[in-house]
Amino acid sequence: MEKKFLDILVCPVTKGRLEYHQDKQELWSRQAKLAYPIKDGIPYMLENEARALGEEELKV
């Protein structure tokens, strides 16, 4: 994921900053506690496509 896209994209729930996790191919919203998947280079920024982040993941 290119930095220029990360500068533009925000969490659709909180409108907050997202973190790119290359190893999991996800964009994380710590504020919403959601991880949005990236499939074939395309971020799926729908709340119903996201998975809930676990407490252990949020500590990292």
UniProtKB/Swiss-Prot annotation:
Pfam family, one: Trm112p
Assigned GO CC terms: cytosol
UniProt cross-references to HAMAP family, sorted A to Z: UPF0434
Family per record: Belongs to the UPF0434 family.
Name listed for the protein in its UniProt record: UPF0434 protein NMCC_0628
Top-level taxonomy: Bacteria, Pseudomonadati, Pseudomonadota, Betaproteobacteria, Neisseriales
